[in-house]
């Protein structure tokens, strides 16, 4: 059923969180309970954005219907529907990221200056579906699938909202909007400020923090991901090891995730130092 056994645990956890969402949808009417739940799940649901990204590169299941169902689940968490990132990210950004005049996730303004983090986030999030549409003109089959399943996702959320407006808003609508912005926001650190136009080894920042890579599916091995975008997320560390001597030291960045890089958290997450 699964293409890679490594996908079993993350899919189980994501589906479990989705089940909790629906249990609360049908059983909880208190705004404050829903608000606290939303606050507690912002970070976990934000991490789901990376797993949706991985799925767009290498499908999780062998059977298309299962992939479509999983994509509907991802849409409810991230606001990114079936094939949007396939068009925008896989067919778009990965082919164009060295050229900031056409990159779908471009971080340069038209005058060539660097966008701020928030300007970039707003720009990429607000234009995501439009830029997906532009890429879709070259891939009409994939775009038709995107339109069909986007309509299905919208219809589902609309039905949920009609039946239980408060619960649907707190559990689905707001998290979907926030998820889309998180998806855009986390990509800023991948390339922003790197004006490399030829060398892929100098065009991506990497974050090799073990906790970050545990919860995002090795998204921090970003040079390797662009070097061979079809490689499954579980195989990126091994691929990184084969090319790490080609990656300049300045292509490695640290982040707030370093706070977890101590013996307590590493043991908690089952990681070795």
What spans do the regions from the language model cover?
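Conserved protein kinase catalytic core
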Residues: 59, 197, 231
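Non-catalytic, topology-defining segments of multipass membrane proteins
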Residues: 1-56, 62-68, 75-173, 233-273
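Transmembrane alpha-helical segments that form the membrane-embedded catalytic/substrate-channel core
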Residues: 42-55, 172-198, 218
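Polar-ligand-bearing catalytic/cofactor-coordination segments
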Residues: 194-198, 228, 238, 245-246
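A short alpha-helix capping/helix-coil boundary motif
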Residues: 68-69, 197
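Short, surface-exposed loop/helix-turn segments at secondary-structure junctions
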Residues: 198-204
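Cytosolic juxtamembrane regulatory segments of multi-pass membrane proteins
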Residues: 72-80, 205-221
């Amino acid at each position: 059923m699964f293409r890679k056994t490594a996908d079993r645990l993350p899919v189980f956890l994501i589906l479990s969180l989705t089940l909790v969402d629906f249990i609360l949808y049908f059983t909880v009417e208190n705004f404050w309970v829903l608000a606290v739940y939303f606050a507690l799940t912002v970070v976990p649901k934000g991490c789901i954005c990376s797993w949706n990204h991985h799925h767009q590169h290498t499908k999780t299941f062998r059977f298309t219907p299962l992939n479509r169902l999983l994509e509907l689940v991802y849409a409810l968490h991230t606001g990114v529907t079936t094939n949007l990132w396939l068009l925008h990210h896989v067919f778009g950004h990965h082919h164009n990221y060295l050229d900031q005049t056409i990159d779908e996730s471009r971080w340069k303004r038209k005058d060539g200056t660097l966008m701020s983090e928030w300007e970039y986030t707003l720009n990429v999030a607000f234009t995501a579906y439009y830029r997906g549409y532009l890429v879709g003109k070259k891939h009409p089959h994939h775009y038709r699938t995107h339109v069909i399943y986007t309509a299905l996702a919208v219809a589902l959320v609309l039905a949920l909202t009609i039946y239980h407006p408060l619960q649907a808003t707190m559990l689905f609508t707001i998290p979907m909007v926030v998820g889309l912005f998180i998806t855009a926001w986390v990509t800023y650190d991948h390339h922003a400020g790197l004006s490399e136009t030829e060398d892929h080894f100098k065009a991506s920042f990497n974050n090799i923090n073990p906790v970050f890579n545990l919860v995002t599916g090795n998204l921090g091995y970003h040079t390797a991901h662009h070097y061979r975008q079809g490689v499954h997320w579980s195989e990126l560390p091994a691929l990184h090891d084969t090319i790490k001597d080609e990656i300049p030291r300045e292509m490695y960045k640290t982040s707030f995730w370093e706070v977890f890089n101590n013996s307590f958290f590493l043991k908690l997450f089952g990681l070795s130092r």
